[in-house]
Amino acid sequence: MQPIDELIERLKKGDRRAVAKLITLVENDESKAKVIIKKIYPLTGNAHIVGITGPPGAGKSTLLDKLIKEARREGLIVGVIAVDPTSPFTGGALLGDRIRMQRHSTDPGVFIRSMATRGSLGGLSKATNDAIKILDAYGCDVIFVETVGVGQIEVDIVKTADTVVLVTIPGLGDDVQTIKAGLMEIADIFVVNKADREGADITYFELTLALDLEKEKWEKIGWKPPIIETVGTTGKGVKELWEKIKEHKKFLEESGKLAEKRRTRIEEEVKTIIAGIVAKKVEASLSEFEDIISMVLNKDLDPYSAADLVLEKIVGR
């Protein structure tokens, strides 16, 4: 493996292999990830990050395949990070039907990487956020982050993306109820994919009703999430979806909300890093504090006071 500085120089020159190697490093070596991000950070902050989320089987990869085409038609450099729940057997990402996107892999203007959540409680891993920064520094104009909308991931995608696209399909049972469990709150654009299926009009109607109930909220924000009907396999509605993504980007920039979002993102990231550092220090030092643990065991000290004492000693170092 080449030295990090050499890889970064190659990244600046548009070397795709260097990008792949840097992402592998941030995935597998936290100490190297720290060095890489420090060095490339001034080059970041230019890409528009679009989260594509929704339940399994919603056809996200098919849609994304078509969205890549739309972006490339405009000459944009595209990055794609496809996040999968970690395979319990290999620790790698489960590729599934994402193979169809690989036809773009010979296009020098498209970089696609599949990543696992890797034990971050089902959420987006720190490595995913670092990979986004690497693609940003590489010069991607738009970075799509595709996730399965389950567990913690759908919450994390809001902290990561500038624009969140929620993809649903007819036939999920109580469609809006299924989505409502946290997902309604996070979407900037709704997509009813596989709109040629029976029940698509009902899904569209239910989403419209649910959004209309939040009328005051949208008026305050200045953006009401549009609902786009698509058929990913034929490309129907994809151009309209791409236009709405661009429209939302323009809204964020002109309203000042993009700067707000990014500030919140940085705050969250710094807090996460601090929490990780403290957790590691506590884990490494806990054996030194056997006396404190014994005091809690003997009811001479409560767990909160014990935690305060341990943190005091660790932070004071």
Curated annotation (Swiss-Prot):
* Molecular functions per Gene Ontology: ATP binding; ATP hydrolysis activity; GTP binding; GTPase activity
Q: What is its EC number?
A: 3.6.-.-
Per the similarity annotation, which family is this?
Belongs to the SIMIBI class G3E GTPase family. ArgK/MeaB subfamily.
Cite the PANTHER family for this sequence.
Answer: LAO_AO TRANSPORT SYSTEM ATPASE, LYSINE/ARGININE/ORNITHINE TRANSPORT SYSTEM KINASE
Q: Which positions are annotated as binding GTP?
A: 54-62, 196, 231-233
Q: Which UniProt keywords apply?
A: ATP-binding, Chaperone, GTP-binding, Hydrolase, Nucleotide-binding
Q: What does this protein do?
A: May have GTPase activity. May also bind and hydrolyze ATP. May function as chaperone.
What are the transmembrane regions?
Answer: none
Q: Which SMART domains match?
A: AAA
Q: List, alphabetically, the CDD domains matched.
A: MMAA-like
What name has this protein been given in UniProt?
A: Putative GTPase PH0274
Q: Which residues form a coiled coil?
A: none
Tell me the InterPro entries matching this sequence. Answer: AAA+_ATPase (IPR003593), GTPase/Isobutyryl-CoA_mutase (IPR052040), GTPase_ArgK (IPR005129), P-loop_NTPase (IPR027417)
Q: What class of enzyme is it?
A: hydrolase
